[in-house]
Amino acid sequence: MSKPRKKGRDINGIFLLDKSQGMSSNDIMQKVKRLFQANKAGHTGALDPLATGMLPICLGEATKFSQYLLDADKRYQVIAKLGERTDTSDADGQVVQKREVNIDLAKILTALEQFRGEIMQVPTMFSALKYQGKALYEYARAGITIEREARPISIFELKFIDYQIPYLTLEVHCSKGTYIRTLVDDLGEVLGCGAHVTRLRRIAVADYPYNKMMTLEQLQQFSEQEDLDLLDQHLLPMESAVIRLPGLHLTKEQARAVGFGQRIKFLNEQGIQGQVRLISPENLFLGVAVIDENSIVHPQRMVVIKPE
């Protein structure tokens, strides 16, 4: 007879993981979930096994707001090796082409101009994007190439950091859906020498502070103290995922109504429309709602806090 499954905790919050190289985002998310003994967890946009850096892990009710972090802009530091193109556009792939690197800094700075602002990008075959229910990387590993349409992305900032032939270091601030490997591969083709990613580190997601990140090893050390309250101190509030939305402060009666999923009308003197954070009279985060043109508040994603 199998043992009954151990019930997880109803813990809510966001853990800023500093992902190490080599692990998949899903594997490391499951480890974080177990260390917190959480009943539910989800990450907010996978990092390649080769990549390191910021990976927000949503626990409990915070998973309802993970999409906002998936959609958030992100910042990366990347080291590209010029002169070699690989099938995956990173160092985990096979080299498919080698070319001489005879590129000066002036040519690099000129080439970077083409990739700033609103641009179109064709997603890499080695991605988790789905085609007929299967991830593109599954087709790629089988030697099958699927036609992909170019998609609009935004490169808010593309900063030159360093160039020591053949290694080029850049910092990229970009919109959701941007593939840094593809950006580097495309840059290599513009330069005429080819390029691939050798190191990639995500240094920011939305407005989360870099210094709040913690590695899995550090989290394990706290876990070994068997003090869950101490562990929970390293969680950020789930409201932080939607902090860019305007806040709407409710009365006690309004808060009770939206808690039951009811729509409410309010005196909208500021003419607010669209998504808002709902705040209780006790200054507690209740969830996210949409205000329509008639100043009707429609609850969208509400927090459910179970009594202890």
UniProtKB/Swiss-Prot annotation:
Keywords: Isomerase, tRNA processing. The keyword tRNA processing applies. HAMAP family: TruB_bact. It comes from Histophilus somni (strain 2336). The active site is at residue 48. One of its GO terms (molecular function) is RNA binding. It holds the Pfam family TruB_C_2. Belongs to the pseudouridine synthase TruB family. Type 1 subfamily. This is tRNA pseudouridine synthase B. Responsible for synthesis of pseudouridine from uracil-55 in the psi GC loop of transfer RNAs. It comes from the Bacteria.
